[in-house]
Amino acid sequence: MPEVVFLLIVVAIAFIVLSIILSFIPVGLWITALFSGVKVGIFTLVGMRFRRVQPNRIVGPLIKATKAGLNLDIDDLEAHYLAGGDVNSVVDALIAAQRAEIGLEFERAAAIDLAGRNVLEAVQVSVNPKVIETPKISAVAKDGIEVMVKAKVTVRANIERLVGGAGEETIIARVGEGIVTTVGSALSHKDVLENPDSISKMVLGKGLDAGTAFEILSIDIADIDIARNIGAQLQTDQAEADKRIAQAKAEEKRAMAVAREQEMKAAVIEMKAKVVEAEAEVPRAIAAALREGKLGVMDYYNLQNVAADTTMRESIAKISKDDNDSHGKDITK
C-alpha cells in the first residue's frame, strides 16, 4: 500500500512538472510550425518566452506568410513585434500586395506600420481607390451669390509617400480651397451652374496631392446649391451702417442746437438782469440830479408824464392784441 501511494505521488509530481514545462515550452506550436514547413527551433521559441514575446504572435503570421510564398525572417518579425508593431497586419499587407502585384518589401511595410498607418488598409486603397466626400463648401462668385458645393474625391494610396505624407484632412482642405478659388474667379454664379466640370478640371490641375499619402484620380462635383445673396446683404448692411452714422451725426447736431439754445436763453436772462439792474439805478440818478441841481422839478414831472404815457400805451396795445386774438378764435370756430 505505501508503495502504491508513493507511486501516485511520483506520478502526480511528474505530471505537474511536465505541465509546467509544456506551458513554458510551446511544443504544440513548434509541432504546428514543423508540419507547416516553417523551420523554427524549439529553443528559439523558448528564447521568445525569456524575451517576453508571445511565440504565437510571431509563428502564426510566419506560417501564414510561408504558405503564401513569402520568404520572411523570424528575427525580423520578432524585432518588429518588440518595436510595438502589428506583425499580423504587416504580413496580411504583404500577402495582399503580392496578390495585387504591388512591390512592397517587409522593411517598407514595417516602417509604415510603425508610423501609425494601417498598412493593410493602405494596400487595399492602393488596389481599390477610395472616395472621399467633402462637406458642403461655401464659395461666393463675383456677382455676390453664395454657392454651396459638395465634391467627391477619388484617391489611391501612394505606398511610397505613406510615411510622412499628409492624410485625408489635407486633401479635403486643399480641394475646398481650390473650389473657393475657382468659384470666386467666376463672373457669375450662373457660369458655375452651367459648367460644374470646370471646377473639377481647374481644381484637379492644381496638383493638390503633392506631399500627401494619396494620388488624386478624379474630382467630381456631387451637388451645387444656391445660398444667400452675399453682395446684396453686404450692401444692405452698409446702407444700414450709413443710416446709423447719419442718425448719429443728426443727433449730434440737434444736441449742439439745443445746447446753443440754452446758451442764448441764459444770455437773454443775463441781459434782462442787467436791464433790471440799470433800471434800478435810474431813480438814484434822478435823485442825485435833483440834489445837485442838474434836474429841475418840472423836468422830473415831464419824465413822470412820459413814463405814465408809455405805460398807458403798452396797456392799450395789450388789450387790442387780446381782443384780436379772441376775435380770430371765434372766426375759426
From Swiss-Prot:
Entries under Pfam families matching the protein: FloA (PF12127)
Description of how the protein assembles with itself and partners: Homooligomerizes.
InterPro entries: FloA
Localization in the cell: Cell membrane; Membrane raft
Function per UniProt: Found in functional membrane microdomains (FMM) that may be equivalent to eukaryotic membrane rafts. FMMs are highly dynamic and increase in number as cells age. Flotillins are thought to be important factors in membrane fluidity.
Membrane topology: Multi-pass membrane protein
Full protein name: Flotillin-like protein FloA
Family, similarity comment: Belongs to the flotillin-like FloA family.
Subcellular location, principal: membrane
Keyword tags: Cell membrane, Membrane, Transmembrane, Transmembrane helix
A GO CC annotation given for this chain: plasma membrane
Organism phylogeny: Bacteria, Bacillati, Bacillota, Clostridia, Peptostreptococcales
Ranges that cross the membrane: 5-25, 27-47
Gene this chain is encoded by: floA
UniProt source species: Alkaliphilus oremlandii (strain OhILAs) (Clostridium oremlandii (strain OhILAs))
